UniProtKB/Swiss-Prot annotation:
NCBIfam families: PRK08061.1 (NF005974). This is Small ribosomal subunit protein uS14. It comes from the Bacteria. GO terms for molecular function: rRNA binding; structural constituent of ribosome; zinc ion binding. PANTHER family: 30S RIBOSOMAL PROTEIN S14, SMALL RIBOSOMAL SUBUNIT PROTEIN US14M. Zn(2+) binds at C24, C27, C40, C43. PROSITE patterns: RIBOSOMAL_S14 (PS00527).
Length: 61
């Protein structure tokens, strides 16, 4: 889990736009971020398994 201070620091933004980075809206994780969902891969997986993400289903081929 990310520290609260890191989440607040990321939300403030930087002087240069290149230095800004995304964090998961649920847990604050910085890596494995999916922009479409605004969450990290772990949170997306948890919500998808619970059926709380509409239109997302487990792949099978």
């Amino acid at each position: 889990m990310a520290n609260t201070s890191k989440v607040v620091k990321a939300a403030r933004g930087h002087k240069f736009a290149v230095q800004n980075y995304n964090r998961c809206s649920r847990c604050g994780r910085a890596r494995g971020y999916y922009r479409f969902f605004g969450m990290c891969r772990i949170c997306i997986r948890e919500l998808a398994h619970k059926g709380e993400l509409p239109g997302v289903k487990k792949a099978s081929w």
